[in-house]
Amino acid sequence: MKAVILAAGLGSRLRPITNEVPKCMVPVNGIRIIDKQIDNLLQNGVTEIFVVDGYKAEILAAHLNEIYPQVHIVSNPRYAETNNMYSLFLTAQYVKGEEFLLMNSDVYYDTNIIEGMLQGENQSKIACDRSGYIEESMKITLDGDKINDISKKITPEEH
């Protein structure tokens, strides 16, 4: 199994914390978010991990090369003018036609989430936190068990 972690974003909502480091390197409970994600992936048998960097790329690359030399770094030099879809596009040559996990690098999650995503027969899955509505978060609408829409613009009534 492969995984793509999108880590190119500016992290502007976390400033001044992200003035010096990319958002994924911010520690939560003493552990960098990116470290928790990579450790969880490795513990669950994910064999190839691709991290797309952008903002403060040199800092993230130095950290990954030191701690996780097996992780592949894909650079998005256009991170300031593009979005996550472009970062994902940059990994196409590595994951095209294969199953892979797609993750945003700024999401802190329970350790059992990856295990749950790898179980079962469904080819496409999405992990959602249904505990509340947060204006800035990505949200989904469902039609039965099918995803109907994914957007930050979904209203509380649609959520």
List the predicted regions and their residue ranges.
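Short beta-strand-to-loop acidic/aromatic patch adjacent to the donor-nucleotide binding site
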Residues: 98-108
